[in-house]
């Protein structure tokens, strides 16, 4: 990876993040992800699926996320936007991605979404201190205007 100010390094970081979330065995690569998320229990992590209140800290997410998950694929589908704040010690990124989930009951989701992440530089490395994906699910028409 090149300089933290180099867009290529942020593209690489986002792609490694997506790869760590992808799995054929139902569990993301939590060892890699534990180095990406700040260890603080007050880090707020939202997801595209419940719980709506999100997770407080990486460990809570790791223990509770998708117990019936059989596979997950995450792929960045567009350019990353990078906004540096606080002399570069805080960076906000966002990018579109495609997400495929499969569950043990045979259901699944194909989602086009955008993720926003707040990264903070700690001990020379950027870690996620807040994450929020957003998407729109297809909703069946209600017949009401």
Where are each of the predicted segments found?
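Short S/T/G/P-rich N-terminal loop/turn motif that feeds into the first structured element of a domain
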Residues: 1-8, 85, 104, 121-123, ...
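Short beta-strand edge/turn micro-motifs at domain boundaries
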Residues: 110-142
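Short, low-complexity N-terminal intrinsically disordered segments enriched in polar/charged residues
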Residues: 1-39, 142-145
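A short, structured loop/turn motif at beta-sheet edges
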Residues: 82-91, 106-107, 119-127
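Short, surface-exposed beta-strand-loop junctions and turns on beta-sheet-rich folds
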Residues: 52, 99-100, 135
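A solvent-exposed, acidic/Ser-Thr-rich amphipathic alpha-helical stretch
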Residues: 11, 30-89, 95-96, 110
